[in-house]
Amino acid sequence: MPAVRSKICGITRIEDALAAVAAGADAIGLVFYAKSPRAVNVQQARAIIAALPPFVTSVGLFVNASRCELGEILDAVPLDLLQFHGDESAADCEGYHRPYIKALRVKAGDDIAAACLAYPRASGILLDTYVEGVPGGTGEAFDWSLVPQGLSKPIILAGGLTPDNVAAAIARVRPYAVDVSGGVEQGKGIKDPAKIQAFMQAVRRSNESM
């Protein structure tokens, strides 16, 4: 099995992005959703991306953004990948002609396989925890046994991951990648370098044992 990749999401500061890179993260996530405590503006995002070395993917997270708002951000910020975390349809996601991943909030009874097929051009599907009225960043894990094997898209596992549970999550789901935000923070939007290191060490150990 290929090595599981990793994304540190909710980056708001250059130093946190560099801590993620130093720990070995493959990608960093920037939240463009004003209601999130981890939201960044265009100026912050540009500065963070400018500080990244080559081959680290910058991901922009959006929640039901208007075409005008999202288009203005794309004109100003050199994002590598878009992450749609709201109720966007496949047509909505594909309208920007950029690589994208679609987040699904998982609850019992969901047909994850069918949901993957509903976004045929997605680069991957991110699975997060369903909490009513909250689009993401809940800090709560969902029941990993709900994720079937053999899905049609690469799976990015999110939702309540921490340095303590990510190894078990990888062993159970065998995802393409894992995505963490609150599990490596010392406060909302402020990352903890030691927790990032611990998370990445757990991912590496899992990769070495597979």
Curated annotation (Swiss-Prot):
Pathway: Amino-acid biosynthesis; L-tryptophan biosynthesis; L-tryptophan from chorismate: step 3/5. Its EC number is 5.3.1.24. It comes from the Bacteria. CDD domains: PRAI. InterPro entries: Aldolase_TIM, PRAI_dom, RibuloseP-bd_barrel, TrpF_fam. One of its GO terms (molecular function) is phosphoribosylanthranilate isomerase activity. GO terms for biological process: L-tryptophan biosynthetic process. It is an enzyme of class 5 (isomerase). SUPFAM superfamilies: Ribulose-phoshate binding barrel (SSF51366). It catalyses: N-(5-phospho-beta-D-ribosyl)anthranilate = 1-(2-carboxyphenylamino)-1-deoxy-D-ribulose 5-phosphate. Keywords: Amino-acid biosynthesis, Aromatic amino acid biosynthesis, Isomerase, Tryptophan biosynthesis. Belongs to the TrpF family. This is N-(5'-phosphoribosyl)anthranilate isomerase.
